[in-house]
C-alpha cells in the first residue's frame, strides 16, 4: 500500500462540509444583525421627526400621485333622431306602416354643446323647443322695446317709461319734485365757495377746475330754465282764469297764443334798459329780413 493511501482519513469530506455550513451561518447571522441595527436606527430617526413634517411629507406624496394619475373625461353620448324613407315591399308583413321611420343613431356633428338639435320635418314646420328649457328673466315685450338711438343710455327715468303707464303731465311731475330745488341751490352755493377758495384751487389742476366751472354753469342754467317754465305756467294759468271768468265753457289757448301772452307779460315787466336791448335786437332782425328781399340778392 502506498504512502498516499496511508495518509487518507475517512472523515475528511465531512469536515469540509461542516466548515462551509458554519461559515454560511455566520454570514446569515451578521446580515440579520445588520438589518436589525438599520431598522432600529430608522425607527430612532422617525421618532425624532415632528408631526408637522410628517404631514407635509404626506401631502407632497399625495400631490405627486394626483399629478401622475390624469383624469379621464368621458365624452357624453347623445342620440339624435334622423328621418329616413324606405320603399314598401309587397310581400312584407307590415304593409300598413308608413313610408318613413325614425331610427336612433349616435352623431357628434349634429349636436351642439351636448344638447339635442331638433330637426324640422319640413322647412315650413314650426320650430320645436323643449318644455324643460327655462324662460329667460329679460324678455322683449312688444311695445316696450328700447329704440336703437337710446340703447346707449343705461339708466332711464322711470317716470317717463312706457311700462309704468301713461305719461303724466310735466306740471304734475314738477309739483311733486319741486322740493329738489333747495338741494340744487345748496349744491350750487357749495360749488361756488370751492371755486372761490384759493387753498382748494392750489391743490387741484387746471383740468379739474375747468370741469367744476362747466358743471356749475350747467347746474345754474338747468335751474333757471325750470324756474322760467314755472313762471310761464303761472302766467298762462292766471290769463286763462281771467278769460274764463264769465264763460260757461272753458276756453284754452293755442301754442302760438300762449307764446304771445308770455312775451307780452315779460316785455311789460322789463326794465327800461332791457326793453331798449330787446327793441334793438328786433329792429336788426327785421332789417336783415328786408335786406334779403332786395332784387340784387335774387340774381344768379
Swiss-Prot record:
Subcellular locations according to the entry: Nucleus, Nucleolus
Residues recorded as bearing Phosphoserine in the entry: 14, 41-42
Alphabetical list of InterPro entries matching this protein: RRP36
Pfam family, one: RRP36
Subcellular location, principal: nucleus
Annotated GO biological process: maturation of SSU-rRNA from tricistronic rRNA transcript (SSU-rRNA, 5.8S rRNA, LSU-rRNA)
Biased composition, class Acidic residues, residue ranges: 85-109
Keyword line: Coiled coil, Nucleus, Phosphoprotein, Ribonucleoprotein, Ribosome biogenesis, rRNA processing
Coiled-coil region: 203-248
Top-level taxon: Eukaryota
Quaternary structure (record): Associates with 90S and pre-40S pre-ribosomal particles. Interacts with CKA1, CKA2, CKB1, CKB2, PWP2, UTP15, UTP17 and UTP22.
Annotated function: Component of the 90S pre-ribosome involved in the maturation of rRNAs. Required for early cleavages of the pre-RNAs in the 40S ribosomal subunit maturation pathway.
Protein name: rRNA biogenesis protein RRP36
The species this protein was found in: Saccharomyces cerevisiae (strain YJM789)
Amino acid at each position: 500500500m502506498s504512502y498516499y493511501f496511508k495518509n487518507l482519513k475517512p472523515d475528511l469530506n465531512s469536515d469540509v462540509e461542516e466548515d462551509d455550513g458554519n461559515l454560511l451561518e455566520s454570514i446569515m447571522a451578521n446580515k440579520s444583525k445588520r438589518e436589525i441595527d438599520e431598522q432600529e436606527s430608522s425607527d430612532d430617526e422617525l421618532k425624532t421627526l415632528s408631526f408637522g413634517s410628517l404631514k407635509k411629507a404626506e401631502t407632497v406624496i399625495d400631490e405627486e400621485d394626483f399629478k401622475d394619475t390624469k383624469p379621464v373625461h368621458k365624452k357624453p353620448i347623445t342620440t339624435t333622431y334622423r328621418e329616413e324613407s324606405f320603399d314598401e315591399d309587397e310581400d312584407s308583413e307590415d304593409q300598413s306602416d308608413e313610408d318613413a321611420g325614425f331610427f336612433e343613431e349616435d352623431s357628434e356633428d349634429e349636436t351642439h354643446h351636448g344638447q339635442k338639435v331638433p330637426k324640422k320635418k319640413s322647412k315650413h314646420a314650426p320650430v320645436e323647443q323643449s318644455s324643460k328649457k327655462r324662460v329667460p328673466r329679460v324678455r322683449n315685450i312688444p311695445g316696450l322695446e328700447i329704440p336703437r338711438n337710446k340703447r346707449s343710455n343705461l339708466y332711464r327715468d322711470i317716470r317717463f317709461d312706457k311700462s309704468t303707464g301713461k305719461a303724466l303731465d310735466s306740471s304734475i311731475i314738477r309739483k311733486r319734485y319741486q322740493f329738489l330745488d333747495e338741494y340744487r341751490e345748496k349744491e350750487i352755493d357749495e360749488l361756488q365757495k370751492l371755486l372761490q377758495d384759493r387753498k382748494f384751487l392750489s391743490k387741484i389742476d387746471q383740468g379739474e377746475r375747468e370741469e367744476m366751472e362747466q358743471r356749475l354753469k350747467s347746474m345754474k342754467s338747468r335751474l333757471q330754465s325750470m324756474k322760467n317754465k314755472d313762471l310761464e305756467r303761472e302766467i298762462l294759468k292766471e290769463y286763462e282764469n281771467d278769460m274764463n271768468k264769465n264763460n260757461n265753457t272753458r276756453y284754452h289757448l293755442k301754442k302760438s297764443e300762449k307764446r304771445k301772452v308770455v312775451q307780452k307779460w315779460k316785455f311789460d315787466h322789463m326794465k327800461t334798459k332791457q326793453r331798449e336791448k330787446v327793441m334793438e335786437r328786433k329792429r336788426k332782425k327785421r332789417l336783415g329780413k328786408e335786406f334779403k328781399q332786395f332784387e340784387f340778392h335774387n340774381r344768379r
